[in-house]
Amino acid sequence: MENANQDTFANPFKFKSEWKNAFTDEEFIKVFASDILENYIINKRWYGGKASTLKYIEVVDHFKITSKKNTYYGVLLEVNFKEAFYQHYFMPLAFMTSDELDTSTIISPAKFGPIEGYLVDALHQEDFRKLLFDNIVQATENPELKLIFHKGMQFHDKEYKSSKFMGLEQSNTSIIFNDAFVLKIFRRIYVSTNPDYEISRFLTERMHFKSSPAYTGSINLALPEGN
């Protein structure tokens, strides 16, 4: 549901586990993939399966990434269609209480143990966007995260100042950092290195090409069956 206010939702989904342990709870994973996600994903602009009939969604992988204030998850989804094919999507996920929300775009109300709040796309939370920026600056590599942060030679900023979305969301989500850098988040995931990333990095670091935006950094998702 696009830009929906949290007050329009029905009662929250209730789970016994704490949010920090959500993806070790089989009940949460089952409800999240079916009852919660199916109604949400079909209305997103980046969802590429609108011409087909959704059969079911499966959580095939996940990782946890934390800031000083919050726990977030990166979730790899496999969307299966009745036409006998599937697509992979990446969703960064947050759970926020009402006073922590930076957005009115809600996935679903939820309750983990005694704590009520909302499941939201983590990219809508400034704390999460800052976390991505800081990890690129530090060029952090942590195999447990299944993420590889790379800082390019042309990236000189060391301090996060601001972030905002660029234009309408299409097949990807673009975020402007410090009014100077654009991070393009690809929602649909392919089991290979993204050609946009390869070309941009090659032109900047190998060819020193000046007529296109310089490559300044990247985030790669390391999957068991590919990149």
Regions found by a protein language model. Give the residues of each.
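Conserved ATP-binding subdomain of kinase catalytic cores across diverse folds
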Residues: 61-227
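Accessory nucleic-acid engagement/destabilization modules that flank
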Residues: 4-20, 54-57, 68-71, 157
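C-terminal low-complexity, glycine/proline- and small-hydrophobic-enriched intrinsically disordered tails
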Residues: 1, 49-66
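Short, compositionally biased low-complexity segments
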Residues: 1-18, 100-113
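Short Lys/Arg-enriched alpha/beta "domain-start" segment
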Residues: 10-54
